[in-house]
Amino acid sequence: PSVPHGTGLMSSALTRRQWERALGFCERNGCRLMFALNCGPSARRPDGSWNPANAEALMAHTASLGGRVDIWELGNELNVFFFVHGLRRQVEVSQYTRDLVALRRLMERYSPGALLAGQGSAFWPVLGEPLGYFFGTTREMLRQAGGLLDAALWHYYPQQSRRCPFGSRR
């Protein structure tokens, strides 16, 4: 599938060859594959909704190869989009729920039997979700989208890297 390249942090793209090699590796070694699909700014329409075109191309290609993805995740750490992409790029939970519905439809078509995981949220000791009062999404996502999900993910960051702008133990 053709993938538009972003800029800066978002300038990389998985090639068809890399994807096929990952699928082959999992097949040969009996590994289960979980893959997070892009739902960041480069995969959004002007109205803010998720554009599933690249995800659909990837899923169709995977199905055509007889490949298998066991778990599809939509996005990663949406609760820090405000920091990474800017305030206007923060995805509302109601929109994310609609995006999950669109992904579930694609999964039914191309990847039946796969599980759907809600985006992994960043979570720090003491702080919880960064600026959680304003941008915390996990509880509301579970309230709105929990019935669509087979798994809800979160990323616990107990180590406090000096590079991390949200460090709580310095």
Model-inferred region functions:
Residues A36-G40, L74-L78, Q119-A122, W154-P158:
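Active-site-proximal beta-strand/loop segments in catalytic clefts of secreted hydrolases
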Residues P1-A53, A57, G67, E73, ...:
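N-terminal substrate-binding region of glycoside hydrolase catalytic domains
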Residues T7, T15, T62, T97, ...:
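Residue-identity detector for threonine
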Residues E27-C31, N38, A63-S64, R105-P112, ...:
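Sec-exported extracytoplasmic/periplasmic mature domains
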Residues N29-L33, G66-D70, S111-L115, G147-D150:
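Short, well-ordered coil/turn segments that N-cap beta-strands
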Residues A55-L58, V91-R170:
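Noncatalytic carbohydrate-binding groove/subsite architecture in carbohydrate-active enzymes
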